[in-house]
Structure formats: C-alpha cells, structure tokens
C-alpha cells in the first residue's frame, strides 16, 4: 500500500489505486495546461510529489525545461523514471538542498492537500528557490458548487479521485489558500481556476447531453467568471518575499 492511500481506509469500499492520477494533457482550461503557462521556458523545476511523472513529462516537453522529481513511493517513482524523469526517492527534506541545488520553480501539482503540514513544506521550499524563483501549485476548491450542493443535502461523501479524494488531509477555498501562502512569506503573483470537465458529475445527464466542445466552453467561462463556485482547482504562482 502506498503511504498516502492508507488515509482512505474507512471512507471507501476499497482503497484508491496509487496510480489513479495520470493521463493529464495540456488542455488550457485544466490545471496541467494552466501550470505549463506559469513555468518559464528553459526553467529548472523541482516537481515535489511527482507521482508517476505524467505532469513532469508534459512540463518537460511543453516548456523545454529540466525537471527533477521527488517521490517517496517506490512504485510511482519507478513509473516516473520510465518516463525519463530524474527522480529522487525521498520526501522534501533540507538535506537535499546541496544535492539538488537551486531551482527556478518548485512545483506542487495536487500535493499540498495531502500533507499534514503544508505551511512547513512551503517554508522549506523557499530554500530550494534561487532569487526570483517561484512556487507553482494546484489545489482543489472545496467550495465548488458540487460540494456546496451535497452539503445542503447533508452529505460529505469521499471519492477515490477529485475534490473529495479520500486521501486529502487539507481542504482549501481561495481565501484559505491565499492565507496559507502569505503566512508562509510568499507574494501571490497569479491565481487561476480550472474548469474540471473531467469530473464525474459532467459525465452523466444532463451534462453528458451537451456536446463536449460546447461544454468545455461553458465550464471554462463559468470558472473564469465565478471561480469560487465553478473552479474545480486553483493554480497559483507565488514568489518568495524578500
């Protein structure tokens, strides 16, 4: 069992697969596509909790950058290595700073919500950044309309994937997300919301009756106009305060 998947015990009928997240693409309305626009071409990137390396590989190809991954789970680290990602099988610890050196970007792609102490991790990440460097992170929006609707119905049902992933330890609104980063001594440069067209709710009636291209346009527009209600994930770029 991968270390993080154990936190799903008691909330699902069976444990989520450690390989459940993959198959991302660079759709500009979704989180990985948004992440790619926040990473400068040729940057040196540290992908913390890189998992199977699917996001790392996309970033390497799209941004022509060098990516080093950190992944404590051996099976996921092996999968990332098979994609050509240079992976260190460890957690983010201070002792890695001399080994890995400074980075232009430290990436947390759907990672901070799985941590007991995201504040401490963000503070440590600053030590891996060179001057002018930034953290880029994606996090789920717990104030999404689907969560609000279920709460009105008296339900807070965990799922294997998505906003209600049973292995999440932390929950974020845009306000609590910004508070976390400012308290950790970052200056927020940009925050954008993803459409989340992959969510299960959009795969069933009445949403499935809408042509995919039209639905993508509607969801993207809604996420931009009302991100706190329709944004599935927030993608943030934040620089270290000097």
Where on the chain are the PLM-derived regions?
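Conserved N-terminal segment of class I S-adenosyl-L-methionine
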Residues: 1-105, 119-122, 193-196, 205-206, ...
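S-adenosyl-L-methionine-dependent methyltransferase catalytic module, highlighting the catalytic core
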Residues: 7, 21, 54, 94, ...
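Short catalytic micro-motifs in class I SAM-dependent methyltransferases
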Residues: 109-114
